[in-house]
Regions:
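Short amphipathic alpha-helical segments and helix-helix/interface helices
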Residues: 29-34, 62-66, 102
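A generic alpha-helix structural signal
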Residues: 33, 69, 86-87
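Acidic, PIN/NYN-like endoribonuclease modules and their adjacent C-terminal/linker elements
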Residues: 2, 16-26, 91-92, 106-144
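Anionic, Ser/Thr-rich low-complexity intrinsically disordered regions
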Residues: 41, 45, 49, 55-57, ...
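Active-site neighborhoods of divalent-metal-dependent phosphate/nucleic-acid chemistry enzymes
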Residues: 73-112, 116-118
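PIN/NYN-family metal-dependent endoribonuclease catalytic core
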Residues: 4-57
């Protein structure tokens, strides 16, 4: 099973953990990462994560996120197909970076796109299952 995590998801452990929902999303995301390390899930990476990480003002956080690139089974760069698909996705109200990341995940054939961004979770995106890490684990546990 292949998963693509967006920048919000990768950054969740570095967010303020005061709210229970943030702590739960963090734990779920860390569980997914452990399954990636163990080879149970495959991590899909895209140029968008490289781009967004470059703007992270916290160097340590950026470095920790970028280490995950070495565990990715595939890394997708910008292409005409991705640009075209991203343009279509932007019509749903997605920002360019988010639309490009989704387009990459779809072209990579990722099974799931994981995000903690509520605005993205509420978009009618087709071609890939979009879940927050908690709901992903809930659906994954039910499928076992």
């Amino acid at each position: 099973m292949s998963v693509c995590l967006d920048n919000c998801c990768f950054n969740r452990p570095f967010d303020d953990q005061t709210l229970l929902i943030i702590r739960l999303e963090t734990e779920a995301k860390l569980y997914v990462q452990e399954r990636i390390r163990e080879g149970e899930f495959e991590l899909c990476w895209s140029f968008v994560l490289d781009y967004e990480s470059a703007f992270n003002p916290f160097e340590e956080v950026c470095n920790r996120i970028m280490k995950w690139k070495t565990l990715a089974c595939v890394d997708y760069d910008l292409s005409d197909e991705v640009s075209t698909k991203a343009d279509d996705l932007m019509k749903l109200g997605l920002k360019q970076a988010d639309a490009s990341h989704f387009a990459c995940a779809i072209y990579l054939g990722a099974d799931y796109f994981l995000t903690t961004d509520k605005k993205i979770l509420n978009k009618p995106i087709t071609g890939i299952k979009v879940l927050n890490p908690i709901d992903f684990l809930r659906s994954y546990s039910c499928a076992e």
